[in-house]
């Protein structure tokens, strides 16, 4: 209930304070978090790109009640909620570079939500960004611009929220 929301403590398994060095990368992540900006990180393997991206949700503002409800509903629709109750931490989605178009934007007969919707309210991290299929990268245009994704099916159109911070990484 809303009383529980006001008293909740959000805890993450990771902490942005764990990142040592990488001052420019940390500054980029702080700017991304403060302004809800998307970001591209380029650097050698083992340079800390994934570590910083995984910790980005921990420096984003706490979720509002409405965000918690919305993220919980999204996870419930695809069976990820289980008995967790209300989701209180921002999502972090890290799809593999072999992810299909349907898994990224959603699809199927029932218009199932994809990674861009599962990342709603949090972070979508695309490591090895140049390895993703061109059509997957192109399909990100709509959610990045409108913060929603539309899936057209013969039964009708499904419009899902897709308000996330996109972090791309490459070597």
Regions found by a protein language model. Name each.
Residues 78-99:
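Conserved P-loop NTPase mechanochemical-coupling segment
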Residues 138-160:
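Substrate-gripping "pore-loop 1 plus following alpha2 helix"
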Residues 34, 39-84, 141, 146:
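Walker A/P-loop
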Residues 13, 17, 59, 107, ...:
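Long C-terminal interaction/binding lobes of large macromolecular proteins
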Residues 93-118:
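Short glycine-rich substrate-engagement loop in P-loop NTPases that contacts/grips substrate
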Residues 1-40, 47, 152:
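Peripheral, non-AAA+ core regions of ATP-driven protein-machinery
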Residues 112-145, 171:
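Conserved AAA+/SF3 P-loop NTPase catalytic/coupling segment centered on the Walker-B
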Residues 92-93, 114-121, 152-171:
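AAA+/SF3 P-loop NTPase mechanochemical coupling elements
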């Amino acid at each position: 209930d809303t009383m529980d929301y006001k008293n909740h403590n959000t805890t993450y398994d990771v902490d942005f304070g764990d990142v040592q060095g990488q001052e420019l990368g940390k500054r980029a992540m702080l700017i991304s978090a403060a302004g809800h900006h998307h970001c591209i990180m380029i650097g050698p393997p083992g340079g800390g790109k994934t570590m910083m991206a995984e910790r980005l949700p921990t420096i984003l503002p706490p979720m509002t009640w409405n965000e918690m409800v919305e993220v919980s509903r999204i996870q419930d629709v695809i069976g990820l909620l289980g008995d967790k109750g209300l989701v209180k931490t921002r999502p972090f989605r890290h799809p593999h570079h072999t992810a299909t178009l349907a898994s990224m934007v959603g699809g199927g007969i029932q218009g199932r939500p994809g990674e861009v919707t599962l990342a709603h309210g949090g972070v979508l991290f695309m490591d090895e960004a140049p390895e993703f299929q061109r059509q997957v990268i192109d399909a990100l245009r709509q959610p990045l611009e409108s913060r929603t994704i539309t899936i057209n099916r013969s039964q009708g159109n499904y419009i899902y929220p897709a308000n996330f911070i996109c972090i791309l990484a490459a070597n």
